[in-house]
Amino acid sequence: MLSRSKPNEAYRQASFDARLLGSSREDLVIFCLEDFIENLGRLEMADSRFDAAGRSQAITRCVTALTALELGIDRTAELGASLAHLYGSAKGVLLNSIRQTDVPAITAIKDDFNEIAAAFRGAMHR
């Protein structure tokens, strides 16, 4: 399947698969956050280039990452409901950006998720 892909896409997929193998639950959360943030950047870039296919691909990957994060929420944890709301709200902004990207909202989401990822990384190293 990778042979049919563009070389950069094949590399991205191989890197994605390699990071998933043997990852702990905590590593997977960080991985999903990083993938989400990276694809928000791709969305911003595709939007600035008027690349509809790139926008669509980035939105799809962002929604997939958010869905994975949502599925991993411990609903009984203190922050469970807040995380579910945050992920759902971000997903709503992305889905509303299918026709026209709300760049300021996407930038704010990216900044928020960079802070969240940093907090998760910090908690892992305690």
Outline where the language-model segments fall.
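N-terminal intrinsically disordered, cationic/polar leader segments
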Residues: M1-L40, D47-S48, A53-A58, T64-G72, ...
